[in-house]
């Protein structure tokens, strides 16, 4: 039995996102290199009332990088009618890649891409695995799973979406433990490999069906198999000694950064 997933983005929403990105380029005098969907729509289990979490990477004109004082390296747009839009400047994004930031790595693996500069994004996707740190990724995902489990799943009635916000990072950590490298962003791809128990798979699919048909705030009774699986998995975690820290070449990031900033394709 395969796991349910969906990535609902209508043509109207896609057009709104592209219009917003073009407006950001005009207002901030930047070039958007890459824009994707993060959050539950990217993970494949959005509720009908889920926001659209649009994340992007952008680059300024060369002169912007010549100032003595550091300048703001994020662009944030107030949430408006379901659209939550925010982006990171390219140098910031590459610094985070150097530190194996899981959030950036997930953006680059998103199943929903609104815009991309093919050459630049292809290079970023090629560089990302060379900087992936199993230790940092595992710590990030286990911390997220434990925090959500302690904070939201201790009562008899629980906020159902939080099970998925625990399961996904927990399975991502197990994916890393299995030596599979960077975890996939889509939850169904992750669970299909990491969950073998048939009754547990069935219960997770029931949870996915409820999540994808209900509001973000839906509460309900505990899912006993999922709950027991999470408790046992969190209790059993121990850090293996041979985890790879990530060993990419910073000079490759510098070369890519220089070439991208100096590229003659910035809109006038």
Task: Name what the model sees in each region.
Residues 244-268:
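Acidic, carboxylate-rich catalytic segments that either coordinate divalent cations
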């Amino acid at each position: 039995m395969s796991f349910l997933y969906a990535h609902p983005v209508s043509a109207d929403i896609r057009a709104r996102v592209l219009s917003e990105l073009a407006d950001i380029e005009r207002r901030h005098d930047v070039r958007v290199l890459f824009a994707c969907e993060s959050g539950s729509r990217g993970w494949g289990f959005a509720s009908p009332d889920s926001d659209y979490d649009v994340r992007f990477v952008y680059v300024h004109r060369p002169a912007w990088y010549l100032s003595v004082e550091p300048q703001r390296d994020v662009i944030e747009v107030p949430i408006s009618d379901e659209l939550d839009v925010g982006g990171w400047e390219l140098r910031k994004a590459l610094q985070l890649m150097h530190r194996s930031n899981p959030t950036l790595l997930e953006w680059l693996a998103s199943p929903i891409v609104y815009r991309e500069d093919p050459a630049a994004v292809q290079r970023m996707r090629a560089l990302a695995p060379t900087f992936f740190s199993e230790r940092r990724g595992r710590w990030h995902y286990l911390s997220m799973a434990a925090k959500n489990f302690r904070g939201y799943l201790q009562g008899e009635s629980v906020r159902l979406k939080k099970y998925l916000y625990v399961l996904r990072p927990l399975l991502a950590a197990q994916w890393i433990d299995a030596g599979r490298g960077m975890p996939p962003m889509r939850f169904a791809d992750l669970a299909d490999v990491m969950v073998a128990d048939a009754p547990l798979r069935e219960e997770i699919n029931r949870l996915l069906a409820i999540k994808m048909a209900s509001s973000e705030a839906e509460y309900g009774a505990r899912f006993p198999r999922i709950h027991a699986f999470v408790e046992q998995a969190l209790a059993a975690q121990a850090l293996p000694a041979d985890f790879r820290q990530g060993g990419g070449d910073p000079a490759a990031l510098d070369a890519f950064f220089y070439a991208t900033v100096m590229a003659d394709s910035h809109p006038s």
